[in-house]
């Protein structure tokens, strides 16, 4: 004996099934949002962390680069080198954890702007700036410590 599925035998259930499928498709951006923001945090954090490791590996050369090559305006080269290295090593860890994501992304965005406008204009910096701006606006996403803390505090 052949039986038909309810979606095929009853037109109203077919419509409900189609509406259900459309509703699930509508939530797809929300479903993909959490992994997207996690990947964005991991990737941009890695970019800056590797840069910080490079700076700390030979800090004397880093200071010379800040004094002669980068010529950062306003700040003394030693302070600029130290603070850039510290931000490049601390902020990525915060981004990876999703802890204080917005605050961690701000110094990295400022550094990106300084690099872009004072030293080396490069298209890649625009991509970094877009991701960091998104993290500042959106936050770390559902897969972040910020989200877990917010859930606990009901913020």
Describe the function of each predicted region.
Residues 1-60, 74-90, 96-155:
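Extended, low-polarity transmembrane helix blocks
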Residues 63-75:
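Perimembrane loop-to-helix junctions flanking transmembrane segments
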């Amino acid at each position: 004996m052949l039986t038909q599925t309810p979606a095929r035998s009853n037109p109203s259930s077919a419509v409900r099934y189609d509406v259900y499928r459309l509703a699930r498709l509508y939530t797809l951006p929300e479903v993909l949002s959490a992994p997207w923001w996690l990947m964005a945090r991991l990737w941009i954090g890695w970019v800056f962390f590797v840069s910080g490791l490079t700076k700390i590996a030979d800090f004397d050369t880093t200071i010379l680069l800040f004094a002669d090559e980068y010529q950062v305006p306003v700040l003394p080269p030693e302070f600029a080198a130290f603070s850039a290295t510290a931000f490049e090593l601390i902020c990525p860890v915060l981004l990876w954890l999703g802890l204080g994501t917005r605050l961690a992304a701000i110094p990295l965005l400022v550094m990106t702007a300084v690099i872009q406008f004072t030293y080396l204009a490069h298209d890649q910096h625009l991509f970094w700036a877009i991701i960091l701006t998104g993290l500042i606006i959106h936050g770390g996403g559902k897969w972040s410590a910020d989200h877990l803390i917010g859930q606990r505090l009901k913020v």
